[in-house]
Amino acid sequence: MRGDIMNIEQVATNFTYEQLASALYLKGELDGFPKVTDKTKWREPVMADKLGHIAHEKISAGAGKDEYGSDAFDPSKEKYAEYKSQAIVEKQLNNLFERSRGKRNYVPLKVTGVYNGAYKQEALDAYKDVDHYFGVFYKEQCVLVINPNTDEVMRQLEYNNANRKEGKTTNLNTVTIDLKDEMLYTVAYKNEEFYIDNIEE
């Protein structure tokens, strides 16, 4: 992995933002994902690869389609999957690893998934029938993916919907999973090498 990091650092040094973004865009086209640089779409094939899923080519499927309310297909379960992701910064690694801070440890990380448009009954109904996966990215490297219980995801979405004030945005319906609440999720993927390299820092 350290050799990979050195190679990535060399690429980052030698190429401009525009060149790197263009390369990512072209990589998406070659792999069948048009406009992969839109709305962190590129994270979806990354998560799908970690989970053994097949990511949808388009950013979102329209209402009425089987894949509506999902980002990928899980062939092992023959079920659709919805992906959410968040980027964390260095200080949040303290929470991810629950590192020591004197006599106590840092509180566990809270992982969030933002559901835009999840204030429509049609969208809420679609989310009931798919699996949900929340990815955690550090420096755009996928370090953890959790699979929250669908019942808990729906409980929070429906609660937020019921308490939305009139006229407020129908976007940003946020589900939060505290990693200390292990009964609410399972770990679907963990970058073990990243954990070994960073957990004690």
Regions found by a protein language model. Give the residues of each.
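Nucleic-acid endonuclease domains
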Residues: 2-79, 83-201
